[in-house]
Amino acid sequence: MGLLRTIALVILGFSAFIFTVLFGRLPVFRKTPIGLLHRIIWLHIPHGISYIDARLFNGRILRSWGQAGNYILYENHPLVLIFFTTILVIGELIFIPSAWPRISVMHQLYIPIIIALPYYFLYVSVVTKSYITPDNHAEEMKRYPYDKVIFHPGHSCETCHFLKPARSKHCSYCKRCVSRQDHHCIWLTNCVGLNNYHYFLYLLLSLSVMLTYGSWLGYSLLSQTLDRLIPPSSPVRLRKQSWPTFLNMWAAVVAYDTRIGGVTMLMFMTAPLAFAFLVYHVYLIWAGMTTNESAKWSDWKDDITDGMAFKFIGDHKRSDSPLLESAETADSWPGYSDQILVLTEGDPPKEGHQVHKSSNDVIQPTNPDAPIDRRFARVRSMKEIDNIYDLGFWNNLCHVFGNYAAGKAHRA
């Protein structure tokens, strides 16, 4: 029982840490204990170490940390990728030789394919880049329209020295602007973007399948071990078991069949992580947004909750809002909206207000007695806002996998 508890606690702690690192920064966890733990790990602990070092050691610890620390924390290094690959390789080297003589020919045919696919999709996810360069910048500028809600024209990247295309983001780790940037993945040492997002989804799917299949296969082998140690005809197996008896029985099995038992527990407790990440990205596809965009939409949701968002409901032909000024069009993109959304400090826009060209912020007139602009209504729900990048789940899915036919047909 002690061995089983120790293995379970170690794996559970590792899984919880990985879950927090992967999901803690997502908007849905922003005001939850998971988000708090993520901030503690990445913000409060480093700041606390820096504070203690400055007060007690005059900064000597961080100075000795020096270049190595900066490399680990701020550079696009392969250490996490090496760790991830090493865990996969070691787990398979422990599990497969022990399981191979005990499984049928059918499983012996399945296993090489199931373990090879994650490596292939990991490789193509790592080597496939979605960088925006001077050579493809003009094409990227036309790929997506600016929605004037979360992406505005006229913003330049101070590092790459060109206008930022819609849906792009500059990555401080890759030190490049990335087309349709979803997130920077430390497990890949690469940004997940336009060109490798579908490979990333295949990686998550293949990992989920491998871990689920491995968990089931390991359970089957451990059940065989249980039958050898405690035959089904044994009184212990025949009578109703209490939880302590049940756990002690399986602890004995894991202690006896350590290689299969340890790796099976690791697969069983980490499979939900891969599956949860896959489900989350399916949700993003359904919603027509990326991880980066979900954070921007979350900010809008907070602004709506605070009563700061307003929508133009008047005649667009009579509007002089810069948010209606035309920019470069994306001829290949079917989504379009002429909505005008603005943000205030909470008061409705007043007649004579101005709107920043590069944002939705309102500059109220200097006259405090200016009347309210009745052409604007307060936004009460996210349902009132159009997301031009959401073409419906099927078309979004086709776009992710590079099939633009559905999108073009949708536009026609």
Curated annotation (Swiss-Prot):
Localisation per UniProt entry: Endoplasmic reticulum membrane
Record function comment: Palmitoyltransferase that targets several endosomal SNAREs. Palmitoylates the SNAREs at cysteine residues close to the cytoplasmic end of their transmembrane domain. May have a role in the cellular quality control of transmembrane domain-containing proteins.
- Its gene is swf1
For this protein, the parts annotated as crossing the membrane are 3-23, 79-99, 108-128, 199-219, 266-286
The DHHC domain, residue ranges: 155-205
Name of the protein described by the UniProt record: Palmitoyltransferase swf1
Protein family: Belongs to the DHHC palmitoyltransferase family. SWF1 subfamily.
Q: What information about domains appears in the record's comments?
A: The DHHC domain is required for palmitoyltransferase activity.
* UniProt EC number: 2.3.1.225
Q: Which PANTHER family match?
A: PALMITOYLTRANSFERASE SWF1, ZINC FINGER DHHC DOMAIN CONTAINING PROTEIN
Q: What is the source species?
A: Emericella nidulans (strain FGSC A4 / ATCC 38163 / CBS 112.46 / NRRL 194 / M139)
Per the UniProt topology annotation, the Cytoplasmic ranges are 24-78, 129-198, 287-412
Q: Which GO terms describe its cellular component?
A: endoplasmic reticulum; endoplasmic reticulum membrane; Golgi apparatus
